[in-house]
Swiss-Prot record:
Keywords: Cytoplasm, Methyltransferase, rRNA processing, S-adenosyl-L-methionine, Transferase. One of its GO terms (molecular function) is rRNA (guanine-N7-)-methyltransferase activity. The keyword Lipid metabolism does not apply. This is Ribosomal RNA small subunit methyltransferase G.
Amino acid sequence: MNDSSLSPEVTADLEYGLDILELDRAYVVPLLAYLTLLIRWNRTYNLTAIRDPREMVVRHLLDSLAIQRYVTVGRLADLGSGPGLPGIPLAISCPSLQVTLVESNGKKARFLREVVRQLGLSNVGVSEVRAEALDEALMYEHLTARALDTLNGIVTVGGHLLKSEGTLLAMKGAYPHEEIAMLPPHWVVEAVHRLQVPKLTGERHLVIVRKR
């Protein structure tokens, strides 16, 4: 499968979303190359329950890119990356960002390595390990997590990776009042942003938590 086999509507949806998010349309080509690989591998390996390419654009690509403005440089660990979300879209749109995709599932990690190879993503590495077992303490300015765990669960398994004053960017649906209240000491909510994801209905929030 190649990019040309994707419908014009898929490309149009992505271009529209990038325009709304004020991101360069130059990212269309690598993002569609990633989407093509995801669709192909998903047939065999069931990497995501979403099958429709247009829905993938909205719920995977644009949803991930909605947080791009909040992290553009430094080192980032994407915990429980799954099929590379939000890590790969962020790496594509932020070439100066050094991204480590942390994924313990073997088939998903193999897919991620293939994406990195085929797209030539020199700013991306893959660690096939659980976050709590990653021996890179205090190495990252940022952590991302999308549908991984509660805020407390995320900082418990991955907090050691962050430098002092580093930030966790946790992607959530509804405003997570109870999760915020359960954060341990030395983790401070810096901001909660309501995300506007093009063509996506329903609530999306980004919780930015700073390590003190």
